[in-house]
C-alpha cells in the first residue's frame, strides 16, 4: 500500500488516498475542538491514543457482527480504512441525560433515561450541525427511510456492544455519536469511536473521562484519555 496525496482534512483527522482506489489512510491529529469549532486547542498525544482506542473498539465491533470501514492499524497515528462515502448525518445515541440534550430539555445531567434516545444531526459546519428528524433528512435528499432504518440498527448494535464492554471496564457509556458510510452497496460504521465522540464516566466516582474535560476546562484531559486507553487495552 502506497500513501498518496491528502484528500481531506477535518477537525481531528486527515484523510489520504492510496494506490488502491477503495482504501484511504486516516491520520489522527492532536487538535481538539469544541462547540462546532469555536473552541480550539491541542491535547498532547490525543491522535495516538484515539487511533489505538478506535482500532481496538472497531475490531471488537467487527467480532460482534458490526461491519466497519476499519482494515488495520498501520502505525501509532494511522489506520488503513475502506474509502466510504460518508452519509452527511451523525447518529447520536443517549443512555443518560447529559450535554446538549440535558440543557435543551431541562434535565439534570446524569439522569437515567427510561429508554435509549436516538437523534440525528445534519453534518454541516455552516449550520452548526443542527438536529433534524428523519423526515428532514429524507426531504432534503441526504438519505432514504430504508437507509435510516439500517443506520439506527447499526447504532443500536454498537450501543449494546459498547455498553456491555465499557461496563466490564468500570465505565458508564453515557452517550456517543457515530458516522456511517456507503461502500459497495453496504452501510459501514465509519469515522472513530473514542473519548472525542463518547461521554464516558467512571462507574465508581462519576469522573468524566472524555472530551468534556476539554470543553469545560476541567483539566487532566490527556490523563483521562490515557485512562480510557488503559482500560480498553486490558
Curated annotation (Swiss-Prot):
Pathway: Purine metabolism; IMP biosynthesis via de novo pathway; 5-amino-1-(5-phospho-D-ribosyl)imidazole-4-carboxamide from 5-amino-1-(5-phospho-D-ribosyl)imidazole-4-carboxylate: step 1/2
Single annotated GO MF: ATP binding
Superkingdom assignment: Bacteria
GO terms (BP aspect): 'de novo' IMP biosynthetic process; cobalamin biosynthetic process
Catalysed reaction, written as an equation: 5-amino-1-(5-phospho-D-ribosyl)imidazole-4-carboxylate + L-aspartate + ATP = (2S)-2-[5-amino-1-(5-phospho-beta-D-ribosyl)imidazole-4-carboxamido]succinate + ADP + phosphate + 2 H(+)
UniProt-listed Enzyme Commission number(s): 6.3.2.6
HAMAP family named among the record's database cross-references: SAICAR_synth (MF_00137)
The family this protein is said to belong to: Belongs to the SAICAR synthetase family.
Protein name from the UniProt record: Phosphoribosylaminoimidazole-succinocarboxamide synthase
Species this chain originates from: Clostridium botulinum (strain 657 / Type Ba4)
Record lineage: Bacteria, Bacillati, Bacillota, Clostridia, Eubacteriales
Gene designation: purC
Amino acid at each position: 500500500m502506497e500513501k498518496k496525496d491528502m484528500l481531506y482534512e477535518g477537525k481531528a483527522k486527515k484523510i489520504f488516498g492510496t494506490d488502491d482506489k477503495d482504501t484511504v489512510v486516516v491520520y489522527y491529529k492532536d487538535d481538539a475542538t469544541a462547540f462546532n469549532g469555536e473552541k480550539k486547542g491541542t491535547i498532547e498525544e490525543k491522535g495516538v491514543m484515539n487511533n489505538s482506542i478506535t482500532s481496538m473498539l472497531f475490531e471488537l465491533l467487527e467480532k460482534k457482527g458490526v461491519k466497519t470501514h476499519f482494515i488495520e492499524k498501520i502505525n501509532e497515528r494511522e489506520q488503513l480504512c475502506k474509502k466510504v462515502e460518508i452519509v452527511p448525518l451523525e447518529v447520536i445515541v443517549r443512555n443518560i441525560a447529559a450535554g446538549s440534550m440535558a440543557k435543551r430539555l431541562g434535565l439534570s445531567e446524569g439522569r437515567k433515561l427510561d429508554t435509549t434516545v436516538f437523534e440525528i444531526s445534519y453534518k454541516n459546519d455552516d449550520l452548526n450541525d443542527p438536529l433534524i428528524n428523519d423526515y428532514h433528512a429524507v426531504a432534503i435528499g441526504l438519505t432514504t427511510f430504508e437507509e435510516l432504518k439500517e443506520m439506527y440498527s447499526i447504532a443500536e448494535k454498537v450501543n449494546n456492544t459498547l455498553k456491555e464492554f465499557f461496563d466490564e471496564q468500570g465505565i458508564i457509556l453515557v452517550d456517543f455519536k457515530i458516522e456511517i458510510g456507503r461502500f459497495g452497496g453496504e452501510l459501514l460504521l465509519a469515522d472513530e469511536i473514542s473519548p472525542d465522540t463518547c461521554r464516558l464516566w467512571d462507574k465508581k466516582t462519576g469522573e468524566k473521562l472524555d472530551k468534556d474535560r476539554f470543553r469545560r476546562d476541567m483539566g487532566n484531559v490527556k490523563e483521562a484519555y490515557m485512562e480510557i486507553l488503559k482500560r480498553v487495552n486490558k
